[in-house]
Amino acid sequence: GTSMCALIAWSDKYFKGGTSTVNDTRNDGWQPLKGLKIIDFSMLLPGPLATLIMADLGAEVIKVEPPGGDYARHMKSFLFEGSNRNKSSIVVDLKAPDAKDIIKRLAEYGDVAIEGFRPGVADRLGIGPDQLQAINPALIYCSLSGFGQTGPISTKAGHDLAYIAMGGGLAQKGQLRQAPSRS
């Protein structure tokens, strides 16, 4: 059978600036990042929020989503729409063998790549800094992770609730001198 990558409508026109952007709320005013091309492999909130700010400031952002889309697409909230306006989107199964050609073309095209995987995941998917910068040495690579790239908890998934708990925020709920209450 044909993999998801082979089914993607991927034209040379795209790489000549012929993108279509949904929910474009930019104006013709101050756009200091105009002309900068961002390849966004991130999902949920931290990475998409960072690239949203770049898009609002004029950068062209291409959001790379897995088959089925960014996890935030399926949440019943404004999270996805609110953090992904002014971006183009493409579906790529990064685990598929034929994804390599698309990844290569994205790396050649982009000025910046951003991902939000736990350490080691991007390398396994073929989108790590060494892999992409071998294609485009000028590519700026941004890696976001909840607990850094090294250290004892670096491989743990980073989410808001974990940060609140580790900072003692959850212990604040309840009565003084009693065990914390559960929600």
Feature locations, PLM:
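N-terminal helix-loop segment corresponding to the beta1-alpha1 unit
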Residues: 7-183
